[in-house]
Amino acid sequence: MEKIKSTTILAVRRNGKTVIAGDGQVTLGSAVVKHTAKKIRVLNEGKVIVGFAGSAADGLALMERLEEKLNKYKGNLVKSAVELAKDWRLDKYLRRLEAVMIAADKNNMLLLSGNGDVIEPDEPVLAIGSGGDYARSAALALYRNTDLDARKIVEEAMKIAGEICIYTNQNFVIEEIE
């Protein structure tokens, strides 16, 4: 079976508001097989937003693990992310999962990968997936050169990514927290 390709996830924080968006396209080989996939979830009673790129089943499994860590560490996102990254890197089952995640709360924005990475960006703009570089570039330009709020930056940058990346569409799921 051909590999499923997708997606674009973008996170921006400005003026106390964190916004994460994901597009809805899932591509299998040269065909779009779904237009309305939901790759963004809200965890920890609405205090954490997570988006994933890669295998849907793997991304959902990792979100469940992150939620368990958030419960264990009383909502501390950084501690939970570090512990998940350790497990992801060391556990024989988890190591095979093919997904990358962005997790954010009102104060933190983190990229988590199966390599054990937990990366906080220098600026509060972070993106993953096939259209991630396009979305991040557009978002950084808007963040640095306009007074647009986080949601508007995300909306505009995702539109640009969707115009450039063939694995990204214009059906966005957007979540925000303050």
Curated annotation (Swiss-Prot):
Domain of life: Bacteria
Main location as per UniProt: cytoplasm
Subcellular location: Cytoplasm
Cytoplasm keyword on record: yes
Molecular functions per Gene Ontology: metal ion binding; threonine-type endopeptidase activity
EC annotation from Swiss-Prot or TrEMBL: 3.4.25.2
Keywords noted in UniProt: Allosteric enzyme, Cytoplasm, Hydrolase, Metal-binding, Protease, Sodium, Threonine protease
Active site positions, chain numbering: T7
Pfam families the record matches: Proteasome
Catalytic activity, as annotated: ATP-dependent cleavage of peptide bonds with broad specificity
A GO biological process held by the record: proteolysis involved in protein catabolic process
Regulation acting on activity, per entry: Allosterically activated by HslU binding.
A Gene Ontology cellular-component term: HslUV protease complex
Binding site for Na(+): G162, C165, T168
Subunit (UniProt): A double ring-shaped homohexamer of HslV is capped on each side by a ring-shaped HslU homohexamer. The assembly of the HslU/HslV complex is dependent on binding of ATP.
Its biological purpose: Protease subunit of a proteasome-like degradation complex believed to be a general protein degrading machinery.
Family per record: Belongs to the peptidase T1B family. HslV subfamily.
Record protein name field: ATP-dependent protease subunit HslV
Organism, scientific name: Sulfurihydrogenibium sp. (strain YO3AOP1)
Gene giving rise to this polypeptide: hslV
